[in-house]
Amino acid sequence: MSNDTGADGGAANPDLGPDADAAAGEGLELAQFAAGCFWSVELTYQRLPGVARTEVGFSQGHHHEPTYDDVCGQGTGHAEVVRVHYDPKACPYGVLLDVFWAKHRPTTLIRQGDEAGTQYRSGIYYYTAEQERVARESLEAKQEEWKEKIVTEILPARRFYPAEEYHQRYLEKGGQSAQKGCTDPIRRYG
């Protein structure tokens, strides 16, 4: 999958440009992860101390302002992602990566469990050169643990489109705890 934004840095198609949004507070940084259906991935990050905010949505595609139905239709190129606003002093990026690797199977190309489609691919989308370095080192270390080849893509974070409000904090709205440090098993649906 090409990540070429062209000579204009994505100006001709803003969806190919970088995610230029700011983190939700002073001292916070952003990270994006694709690891299958975003509902349970989001709840996992919500529970993590040092994470100030999570959002589910779509990134890495080429369709302007996609909806959930657009993305599920397979024509937009987007992945379902969780965008994490985190305090790197309280929760280093490496901890976010540990959660990412533990949450899904990074050796399946376009599926996680029963869910199939390019929107369910495995991806780490970085905002800084340091995030890229740590992500690539993390992938190399994880590859030593897997017999199958890891297919996780590591690319610059592109423009983020929030999913419809219905999807935000979906499992928490369905009664599952998002309390920091909670270790209750995550049920797939609320």
From Swiss-Prot:
The keyword Oxidoreductase applies. It is found in: Cytoplasm, Cytosol. Residues 1-20 are annotated as: Disordered. It is an enzyme of class 1 (oxidoreductase). One of its GO terms (molecular function) is L-methionine-(S)-S-oxide reductase activity. Keywords: Cytoplasm, Oxidoreductase. Signal peptide: none annotated. It catalyses: L-methionyl-[protein] + [thioredoxin]-disulfide + H2O = L-methionyl-(S)-S-oxide-[protein] + [thioredoxin]-dithiol; [thioredoxin]-disulfide + L-methionine + H2O = L-methionine (S)-S-oxide + [thioredoxin]-dithiol. GO terms for cellular component: cytoplasm; cytosol. InterPro entries: Met_Sox_Rdtase_MsrA_dom, Met_Sox_Rdtase_MsrA_sf, MsrA_MetSO_reductase. One of its GO terms (biological process) is cellular response to oxidative stress. SUPFAM superfamilies: Peptide methionine sulfoxide reductase. The keyword Magnesium does not apply. Residues 10-20 have a biased composition (Low complexity). Its EC number is 1.8.4.11. Catalyzes the reduction of methionine sulfoxide (MetSO) to methionine in proteins. Plays a protective role against oxidative stress by restoring activity to proteins that have been inactivated by methionine oxidation. MSRA family specifically reduces the MetSO S-enantiomer. Belongs to the MsrA Met sulfoxide reductase family. HAMAP family: MsrA (MF_01401). This is Peptide methionine sulfoxide reductase A2-2.
